């Protein structure tokens, strides 16, 4: 797990490298599904908590103020139910990991998912003081799991999103 968060930590560190040492801690909100809310494990072991601890150990003053996520959430549910809560939290940094349930539960097309994810990104960036303070975490690669069929769909989606 540690290797998997090294790149996000590095990228996040670069985004905040110019932050003054005596500045107020960065207000961080994590948005997502069961991966984000740490279903089945303690919150301190969730990836948002681990990312926060890694950034703190790198000298970045940051506080994870809220994990806005739901078990089984799709991108549409996140748009409808989670996004209205974001504005009042006044985040300065947001991570987004969503999409697995779109594929598993809904089986949506990549074009429909692309529309939803772009809408989520726009809404998040509109609630941030700097649109560069959003870290988008991709859907996990299922190619090494029993759900290999989903892995092929995810890979195709990611390639389309990168276009």
Where are these regions (language model features)?
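Bacterial N-terminal signal peptides that target proteins for export
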Residues: 1-9
């Amino acid at each position: 797990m540690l290797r998997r968060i090294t790149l996000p930590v590095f990228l996040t560190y670069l985004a905040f490298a110019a932050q003054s040492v005596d500045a107020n801690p960065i207000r961080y909100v994590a948005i997502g599904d069961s991966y984000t809310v740490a279903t089945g494990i303690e919150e301190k072991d969730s990836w948002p908590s681990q990312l926060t601890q890694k950034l703190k150990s790198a000298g970045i003053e940051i506080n994870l103020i809220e994990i806005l996520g739901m078990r089984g959430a799709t991108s549409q549910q996140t748009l409808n139910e989670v996004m209205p809560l974001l504005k009042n939290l006044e985040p300065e940094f947001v991570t987004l990991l969503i999409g697995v349930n779109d594929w598993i539960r809904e089986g949506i097309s990549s074009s429909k998912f692309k529309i939803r994810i772009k809408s989520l990104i726009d809404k998040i960036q509109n609630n941030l003081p700097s649109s560069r303070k959003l870290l988008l975490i991709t859907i996990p690669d299922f190619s090494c799991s029993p759900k290999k069929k989903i892995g092929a769909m995810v890979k195709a989606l990611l390639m389309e999103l990168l276009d």
